[in-house]
Amino acid sequence: MKVILLGAPGAGKGTQAQFIMHKFGIPQISTGDMFRAAIKEGTELGKQAKALMDQGKLVPDDLTVALVKDRIAQPDCAHGFLLDGFPRTIPQADALKDAGVKIDLVLEFDVADEVIVERMSGRRVHQPSGRTYHIIYNPPKVAGQDDITGEELITRADDKAETVLERLAVYHQQTKPLIAYYIAEAEKGNTRYERLDGTKPVEQVSAELANIFNQ
């Protein structure tokens, strides 16, 4: 099963990707991880990507698609893969299609912006240990303090409300058009499109995913 995950940052894609990987034995492919691996291995594509990144330039779509094609040709992808964080734009989706990569299933995690802001801006972290809390869903015993050490909890820069809103604006501008793109592809019979309510409890979303994969 070749799967694309769509959804705003904080919609729960990462949590459910872990569930799918463990339950169905499909590797998760993140373009960020791929670039890091290609650069570390010193592959030709890795060298090209590194040269651009070192200059602060964006890696062009054709190079990213070439890297994705390389990665999905590896033996662990024989039974499928999960693409997370790619494609992000319509040109990238077109490039993937033109490269002959057939997608079986597109999963959209649908969560309203205000819920995402509440989820992410409510996170608190104990930096030394990495323990995470949430002021509503998983509060520490004493507000602002780590349960074990009593040390101060912080809000990561990425989780601050204004940063979350900026990331959501980019998502709506760049990536949301992909939802219409893949719904149209599904209507043509080129893929299957499923929308999940990301506000439901994690276990419920996982159960719905298992049903989708078993259909």
Curated annotation (Swiss-Prot):
GO terms for biological process: AMP salvage. It comes from the Bacteria. It is an enzyme of class 2 (transferase). SUPFAM superfamilies: P-loop containing nucleoside triphosphate hydrolases. Disulfide bonds: none annotated. Transmembrane segments: none annotated. It is found in: Cytoplasm. GO terms for molecular function: adenylate kinase activity; ATP binding. GO terms for cellular component: cytoplasm. The keyword Amino-acid biosynthesis does not apply. InterPro entries: Adenyl_kin_sub, Adenylat/UMP-CMP_kin, Adenylat_kinase_CS, Adenylate_kinase_lid-dom, P-loop_NTPase. Its main location: cytoplasm. Pathway: Purine metabolism; AMP biosynthesis via salvage pathway; AMP from ADP: step 1/1. AMP binds at residues 31, 36, 57-59, 85-88, 92, 156, 167. Residues 30-59 are annotated as: NMP. ATP binds at residues 10-15, 123, 132-133, 200. It catalyses: AMP + ATP = 2 ADP. Belongs to the adenylate kinase family. Monomer. This is Adenylate kinase.
